[in-house]
Structure formats: structure tokens, C-alpha cells
């Protein structure tokens, strides 16, 4: 998972996508922001769905999607059409992560409304319902995306987000959580699904990662991570040599996590993508 708002150029995206395919990774997900979180207006950002559509034409097997597209950016018909277009270009490899939006400074900078969280949650539910209708039954919305893109909703498993996910989504994605927190959050999602009389959602995790093939490589990457992040002393939940990171991922698997999206903050470090591919083979 790449933070596209942190100055990731088209050349970077091409290199990252090629590395993901070569390394054997399942997918390449990106954030959907217009303003840098770390550097404010000093870093550029390409539009998420334009980027995904372009990458869909340049890749062969990678899953592509957002974590997550804010409902405050686009009307639901525009978002549904953008995703459906990318789905056709990709031959069925696109997934939509969608959320209520949180980055107030970004909304102010670009002129988006940023209502209170309750209103944003109302809009999330409205857009989920509208997108499902546009993709499935609305007679005016053609072509229908086939297969239907998976819908991902996530957060920290608070009641309202879980209810929305259970009504409309295929997957619940929690973020930056320990294995113990994942176990608790999965239990809440599963309980809500049972109460609604539906099958369990796929339960996934998005969290940061810094890995190295040995401790020297790892130390270099940790130093670079802290420089990019601007927070000395901070390390992500999945940090270590390949063997150490594999052991950590097995802890998440034991806690009920079925899929992991590892956040890669240093988009110029393409070699770490290959290291993540080696890590994936260790735990497959």
C-alpha cells in the first residue's frame, strides 16, 4: 500500500507496479488523497482512480485499489463509473476501499465540504447503497462492472462502521492494529455479520512495514522510514528481518487476519518491494 499523496510520480508508479508483479505480490493499493500528510503542499499527488486506470492497462495480474476513497471527494455516480471503467480496463482486477474521510486540512485546501463525522457517516452509507445499485440494478448505468468489484470498508471496528460494512461490503479492513486488537475487532465484525444473517466478511489489516534481508539492511530502512515519516524512534507494526517479519505476520494470521496490506512509505525504495515478495513467499 503506497501513500500516493507523498510525491509519487507516474514514473514511480510504473516502477512500483512492475516490481510488485515481478516480486509475485498479489496487489498494489494506494491512498486517495490530494494533499500530502507529511509535507503539506510541498508534495504532489496524482488522482487515485486515474492512476489505477492507467496502471490497469500496464499490468497483467495485480489487484489494484484504494485504501480508501473518501465519500467527500466525488458524487457516488462519478466514483462508481471511475471504478467500473478501471475494472473493464483491468479485466476484473479492481477493488474499491471507501471511507468517510478524515483529513480536514485537505478538504479546506481543495474546497471540499467537511461536515461533522455523523454527516460523513450518513454519506458513506448513502454512497455504498448508491454504488451497489449502480453496479447491480440501475438501468441507466452501463456497462456493469464484471466481475463486480469488491467493496472494502474499514476502521477500528466501531459500531456504525461495522454496521455499514455488514450491509454493503465484502471485506472489513482494520488499520495499524496489534494482533490482540485485530482479534477483538474481528470478533465484533463477525458478531455483527451473524446478527445480520450473512456470511462473515473477509477480515484484513493495513499496517506499516519495514523489512530487511539482514540487520544492516533493516537498520538502513528504519532510518529512512523515520526520516520520511518525520518521527524519530517510530517503527511500524511489521518491522524486522524477513524471518522476524514472517513470525509477526503469523501472529496476525492466528488473530484472524486473512489478508494484509503492508504500507510502504519510501516509494523510491523499489528493492523493498522485492523484499516484501520474498516475505510473502515465506508465509504463503
What is each of the regions a protein language model found here?
Residues 1-284:
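Active-site-adjacent structural elements that line small-molecule/cofactor binding pockets in enzymes
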Amino acid at each position: 500500500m503506497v501513500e500516493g499523496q507523498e510525491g509519487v510520480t507516474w514514473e514511480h508508479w510504473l516502477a512500483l507496479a512492475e516490481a510488485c508483479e515481478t516480486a509475485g505480490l498479489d496487489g498494489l493499493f494506494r491512498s486517495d488523497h490530494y494533499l500530502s500528510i507529511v509535507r503539506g503542499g510541498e508534495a504532489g499527488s496524482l488522482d487515485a482512480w486515474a492512476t489505477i486506470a492507467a496502471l490497469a492497462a500496464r499490468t497483467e495480474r495485480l489487484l489494484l485499489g484504494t485504501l480508501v476513497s473518501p465519500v467527500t471527494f466525488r458524487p457516488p455516480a462519478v466514483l462508481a463509473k471511475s471504478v467500473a471503467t478501471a475494472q473493464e480496463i483491468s479485466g476484473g482486477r479492481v477493488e474499491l476501499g471507501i471511507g468517510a474521510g478524515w483529513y480536514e486540512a485537505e478538504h479546506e485546501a481543495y474546497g471540499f465540504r467537511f461536515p461533522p463525522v455523523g454527516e460523513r457517516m450518513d454519506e458513506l452509507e448513502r454512497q455504498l447503497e448508491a454504488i451497489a445499485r449502480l453496479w447491480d440494478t440501475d438501468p441507466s448505468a452501463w456497462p456493469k462492472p464484471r466481475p463486480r468489484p469488491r467493496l472494502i470498508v474499514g476502521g477500528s471496528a466501531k459500531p456504525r462502521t461495522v454496521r455499514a460494512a455488514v450491509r454493503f461490503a465484502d471485506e472489513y479492513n482494520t488499520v495499524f492494529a496489534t494482533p490482540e486488537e485485530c482479534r477483538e475487532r474481528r470478533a465484533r465484525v463477525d458478531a455483527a455479520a451473524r446478527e445480520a444473517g450473512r456470511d462473515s466478511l473477509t477480515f484484513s489489516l493495513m499496517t506499516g512495514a519495514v523489512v530487511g534481508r539482514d540487520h544492516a539492511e533493516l537498520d538502513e530502512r528504519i532510518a529512512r522510514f523515520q526520516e520520511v515519516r518525520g518521527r524519530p524512534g517510530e517503527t511500524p507494526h511489521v518491522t524486522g528481518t524477513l524471518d522476524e517479519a514472517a513470525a509477526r505476520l503469523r501472529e496476525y494470521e492466528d488473530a484472524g487476519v486473512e489478508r494484509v496490506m503492508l504500507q510502504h512509505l519510501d516509494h523510491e525504495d523499489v528493492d523493498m518491494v522485492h523484499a516484501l515478495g520474498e516475505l510473502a513467499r515465506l508465509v504463503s
